[in-house]
Amino acid sequence: MSKVIGIDLGTTNSAVAVLEGGQPKIITNPEGARTTPSVVSFKNGEIQVGEVAKRQAITNPDTIASIKRHIGEAGYKVTVGDKSYTPQEVSAMILQYIKKFAEDYLGEEVTEAVITVPAYFNDSQRQATKDAGKIAGLDVKRIINEPTASALAYGLDKTETDEKVLVYDLGGGTFDVSVLELGDGVFQVLSTNGDTRLGGDDFDEAIMNWLVENFKSDNGIDLSKDKMAMQRLKDAAEKAKKDLSGVSSTQISLPFISAGENGPLHLEMTLSRTEFDRLTSDLVDRTKAPVMNALKDAGLDANEIDKVILNGGSTRIPAVQEAVKNWTGKEPDHSINPDEAVALGAAVQGGVISGDVKDVVLLDVTPLSLGIETMGGVFTKLIDRNTTIPTSKAQTFSTAADNQPAVDIHVLQGERPMAADNKTLGRFQLTDIPAAPRGVPQIEVKFDIDKNGIVNVSAKDLGTNKEQKITIKSNSGLSDEEIDRMMKEAQENEEADTKRKEEVDLKNDVDQLIFQTDKTLKELEGKVSDEELQKAKDAKEELVKAQQENNLEDMKTKRDALSEIVQELTVKLYQQAQEAQQAAGGAEGNATDAKTDDGTVDGDFEEVKDDKE
């Protein structure tokens, strides 16, 4: 069975891991980095992903970052040139890139993956993530929650201990907190909570706003109107945030950020950790309520938690660590890398699926309550939040009017009492209900949630046994046909990228061969026949002509022909050099012999003794 890779598809950075020898291992990207920026750029018809895309964000407007914030969002598209892309397609480009370098590392095709999502992702966002995997050519065997994955990475070697663990996960764009119970190889999620609109990007933005305000105050120029300046500010803000995790103040220096009446203007400011904490205190405070709610839903007090695990790059911020310590009364555990834990845990789950990991059971929960709209616009819950999945629940309803021929089933997810305030997952209709007074027909509505947290709903008329089912699709509205089309386009893009690389490699080979041929022909002058030299020159000219015409097939043929001729001539030159060396060696040997025969002088000697002795 091929390997099941674990992918942490993050807002700002992504990572991939695989199980080797019973232990999860991060797979480095082509640049040698253990995480890959979740950034995609489009340039000259080429799609670039990762660090190379992030580096050109300042100068290339066709660069997309933090697309995860919009996954599952109805109608959201990014326009690049004359083409529009859904968040699933952009995410698929990142996944495709990760899949490719994972295959290069493993030396085999990768078709199966476990992909992580924020614990507080709703059904639409989970389904959209699964669709992105499918577009990228991956069979997504399981969608698991990020905090749960971290706990898997943490607890893999601790299956004999019983612990209650709180995972605080503050990533680039989302925040989650989960409470789990670990024991005897069972990882049971007791509760989960979070905020899918809060993350490290917001901390960066707080610094950016501070820089914009101060620069405007000093120079009267609003940098927020300058797109290129704002990208430079974003990069500087991110760097300053990271610096302040280790130092008490940092210098932000951006020369030529703008221009005034008297010439260029430079941004030079010092940001202290104290000021940074003041700017972001409201963001840190926003994470407190989800922590307390998760503890409450788990039926635990903070002092009953054995371990606190920090996950996500933003948990390196000292104020965040201090806040978590104050709220839980526990010093956070730093035994796992917050940037890598999620991918490592996903790889462990991949090992469970492939059978490489035994005696580990993962029991996750649904993050939000599920139900339907009933009379008066009320949201009636069928499955409460933090119910262990997979699960199934049925409830019987009836008609609201006499002789009602059909019922509309409006499926919702959320915690608010009124249907209008919750997230619509889908609608469907059960028709052909026999005429009967109000309240007589018995309509059974059944919810099924699978292990990925994806919802199936059915409605059945118990009188006629007529049934209607719906698998809740992502509200982004991607049909199976659209997903298939996007998969085909993704494969074509990959093929086009491969072809483009082959073209570049061919042109580089040709340039190098022409240069090498010119050099070799100069060395061969007077050492091989004129006919042989002319043959090589003619072959070179034919290759130059094919190069100028950009005829790729002709270039391949002419390159191979010239390469063969040059190789033959080089071998000949080498043989000549060897023969000359041997001849020179023989002549030197003769000269030495002659000296021995003619130049040796025999002489007598006598011992001279010291007379003073």
Curated annotation (Swiss-Prot):
Q: Please report what switches on or represses expression of this protein.
A: By heat shock as well as salt or ethanol stress.
Gene Ontology MF, one: unfolded protein binding
- Report the residues modified as Phosphothreonine: 174
Alphabetized InterPro entries for the sequence = ATPase_NBD, Chaperone_DnaK, Heat_shock_70_CS, HSP70_C_sf, HSP70_peptide-bd_sf, Hsp_70_fam
Per UniProt, the keywords (alphabetical) are: ATP-binding, Chaperone, Nucleotide-binding, Phosphoprotein, Stress response
Ranges where the record places region Disordered: 577-613
Q: Which PROSITE patterns match?
A: HSP70_1, HSP70_2, HSP70_3
Q: Where is the composition biased (Acidic residues)?
A: 599-613
> What is its biological role?
Acts as a chaperone.
The UniProt entry's sequence similarity note says: Belongs to the heat shock protein 70 family.
- Please give the name of this protein: Chaperone protein DnaK
Instruction: Record the organism.
Output: Latilactobacillus sakei
